């Protein structure tokens, strides 16, 4: 299947809609699988500190394969790369259903996710460009967050009913994503003919890291998105421990409902960013980043469900407004310097290194017995300070 696709085409084109549907199903599977697998660990009496370790093996796959997945995304039609990556996710989820060690199956899903990410974001810059790219990113983030919303809730609710049924639903979602990938137009490879020697690929990747880091705008984007997603994944696991302590609720579903409120908020924030922020006014998103940390600290002190829902909705809105412009900035500047696939692969390395560090610190805090409420307060304060420092740094760099 092939189809000529020009940049600057409508964000409602066949190609873009196919990408969005595939992304929704794949992200639905990712989020349902996380909570279904956490329920499986609970049912098999794994210790609490092993829960973030599950995500750490997933993140470790991103870091290990970071030097290679960007070149893969740029060397082949990105829609086909997405299809193969979703096939790996399907294999991992099916393996957990069939009884293999959940950490092994989840690692395979992580490998698929590592290959998938540069292709899914890189293809946006091939289907559209300029300020339409910000809108396309908003659409992608809205689709992703809708999938997080539904997938997280489905994973928790189904796991309360039957853990294996929840795992089967995840595998079916990945199968649907593979099918949707078939309808993405086969675009010309962005950078064919590159060397496939591991040493050359590694060298090329780290050269891309250097190029992006030396550019003030892309460095700013890399640090900002890394902090955001590192904090976001840590918050998901914090909620799993915080809910029983602060609210006295012990089921699998309530943490997923709370995560869903963050997802709803991100959809709203992403939509606002698409309308209010352009590539030239990215710094408008920074106050929202600082407020995320402030609201997380306030949230950690709550003991009632209704204010918890409201504050998590606000956290999500601030998060969507913060991260969407940073993603668009990196894609646009990175496409021109190192290729969209390599730019996203470098971004993934930064984001997942931040996730690994934050999850490691969180797991250590749980292991030594720090209360969940204290972890939440400290986490929020440190995040606000980190974003404030990044903003000051960016303003100083811009003034030179």
UniProtKB/Swiss-Prot annotation:
Regions crossing the membrane: 19-39, 53-73, 91-111, 139-159, 164-184, 195-213, 227-247, 257-277, 281-301, 304-324, 352-372, 373-393
CDD domains linked to this entry: MFS_MefA_like (cd06173)
Subcellular locations according to the entry: Cell inner membrane
Gene Ontology MF annotations: lysophospholipid:sodium symporter activity
Entry GO terms, CC: plasma membrane
PANTHER family (alphabetical): MACROLIDE-EFFLUX PROTEIN (PTHR43266), MAJOR FACILITATOR SUPERFAMILY (MFS) PROFILE DOMAIN-CONTAINING PROTEIN (PTHR43266:SF2)
Keyword rRNA processing carried by entry: no
Family the UniProt entry places it in: Belongs to the major facilitator superfamily. LplT (TC 2.A.1.42) family.
Keywords on record: Cell inner membrane, Cell membrane, Lipid transport, Membrane, Transmembrane, Transmembrane helix, Transport
Function: Catalyzes the facilitated diffusion of 2-acyl-glycero-3-phosphoethanolamine (2-acyl-GPE) into the cell.
Protein name stated in the entry: Lysophospholipid transporter LplT
Main location: membrane
InterPro entries per the UniProt record, alphabetical: LysoPLipid__transptr_LplT, MFS, MFS_trans_sf
NCBIfam families per record: PRK11195.1
Membrane topology (UniProt): Multi-pass membrane protein
Disulphide bridges, residue numbers: none
């Amino acid at each position: 299947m092939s189809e000529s696709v020009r940049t600057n085409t409508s964000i409602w084109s066949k190609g873009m809609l196919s990408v969005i549907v595939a992304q929704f199903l794949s992200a639905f599977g990712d989020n349902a699988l996380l909570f279904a697998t956490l329920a499986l660990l609970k049912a098999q009496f794994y210790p609490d500190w092993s829960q973030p370790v599950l995500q750490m093996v997933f993140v470790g796959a991103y870091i290990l394969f970071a030097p290679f997945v960007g070149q893969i995304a740029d060397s082949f039609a990105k829609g086909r790369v997405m299809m193969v990556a979703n096939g790996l996710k399907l294999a991992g989820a099916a393996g957990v259903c069939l009884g293999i060690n959940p950490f092994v199956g989840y690692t395979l899903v992580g490998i698929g996710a590592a290959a998938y990410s540069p292709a899914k974001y890189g293809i946006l810059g091939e289907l559209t460009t300029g300020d339409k790219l910000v809108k396309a990113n908003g659409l992608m983030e809205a689709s992703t967050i809708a999938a997080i919303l539904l997938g997280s809730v489905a994973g928790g609710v189904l796991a309360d009913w039957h853990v294996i049924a929840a795992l089967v639903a995840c595998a079916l979602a990945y199968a649907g994503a593979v099918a949707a990938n078939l309808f993405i137009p086969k675009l010309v490879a962005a950078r064919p003919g590159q060397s496939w020697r591991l040493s050359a690929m590694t060298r090329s990747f780290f050269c891309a890291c250097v190029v992006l880091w030396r550019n003030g705008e892309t460095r700013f984007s890399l640090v900002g998105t890394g902090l955001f997603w590192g904090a976001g994944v840590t918050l998901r696991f914090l909620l799993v421990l915080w809910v029983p302590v602060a609210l006295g609720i012990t089921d699998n579903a309530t943490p997923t409902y709370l995560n869903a409120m963050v997802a709803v908020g991100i959809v709203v924030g992403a939509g606002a960013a698409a309308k209010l922020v352009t590539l030239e006014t990215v710094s408008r998103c920074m106050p929202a980043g600082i407020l995320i940390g402030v609201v997380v600290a306030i949230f950690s002190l709550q003991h009632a469900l209704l204010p918890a829902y409201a504050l998590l909705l606000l956290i999500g809105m601030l998060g969507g407004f913060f991260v969407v412009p940073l993603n668009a900035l990196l894609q646009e500047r990175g496409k021109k310097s190192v290729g969209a696939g390599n730019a996203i692969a470098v971004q993934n390395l930064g984001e997942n290194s931040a996730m690994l560090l934050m999850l490691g610190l969180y797991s250590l805090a749980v292991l030594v017995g720090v209360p969940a409420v204290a972890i939440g307060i400290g986490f929020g304060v440190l995040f606000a300070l980190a974003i404030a420092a990044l903003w000051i740094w960016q303003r100083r760099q811009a003034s030179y």
